[in-house]
Amino acid sequence: MVKRFFESYHEVPDGTQCHRKTYITTALGGICGIIGSAYRVSLNPADSTLEAVARVGRYTFTAAAIGAMFGLTTCVSAQVREKPDDPLNYFIGGCAGGLTLGARTHSYGTAAMGCVYMGTAAALFKIGKLEGWELFPTPKV
């Protein structure tokens, strides 16, 4: 399922159909949030069911918001700069996602490190896509 989302994200050229790309990155962020919250709730059980649901929602919606900011910022940056295949657009989008995480945690340090790390990871992802690196290689039998 995640592989299909990655493929559908790259079907649309960068800088076009921002609403579709933002939807896809929001869904990917939400999936990551659900997975992370499942680990969090199972490894650190909550005292009540309501608290567990609140934790799941908090992690899921935070990750979805980070994905949405990444998708929207990357697409708008590609349109404004008129350079759709530039890894800098992905760095800017990753930085926006890191700043969103910092705003959620009320921490300048988290925002700064999130900007650097998420921006670098996103730029490397774009560079890998441009150079033909495989994120999900097919097994060789």
UniProtKB/Swiss-Prot annotation:
Alphabetized UniProt keyword annotations: Electron transport, Membrane, Mitochondrion, Mitochondrion inner membrane, Respiratory chain, Transmembrane, Transmembrane helix, Transport
Subcellular location: Mitochondrion inner membrane
Membrane topology category: Multi-pass membrane protein
Gene Ontology cellular-component annotations: mitochondrial inner membrane; mitochondrion; respiratory chain complex I
Origin: domain of life: Eukaryota
Short name of any one Pfam family annotated for the protein: Tim17
GO biological process: aerobic respiration; mitochondrial electron transport, NADH to ubiquinone; proton motive force-driven mitochondrial ATP synthesis
Keyword Mitochondrion: yes
Transmembrane spans: 21-43, 58-80
Principal subcellular localisation of the protein: mitochondrion
Biological function: Accessory subunit of the mitochondrial membrane respiratory chain NADH dehydrogenase (Complex I), that is believed not to be involved in catalysis. Complex I functions in the transfer of electrons from NADH to the respiratory chain. The immediate electron acceptor for the enzyme is believed to be ubiquinone.
PANTHER family (alphabetical): NADH DEHYDROGENASE [UBIQUINONE] 1 ALPHA SUBCOMPLEX SUBUNIT 11, NADH-UBIQUINONE OXIDOREDUCTASE SUBUNIT
Subunit structure: Complex I is composed of 45 different subunits.
Family: Belongs to the complex I NDUFA11 subunit family.
The protein's name: NADH dehydrogenase [ubiquinone] 1 alpha subcomplex subunit 11
Gene expressing this chain: Ndufa11
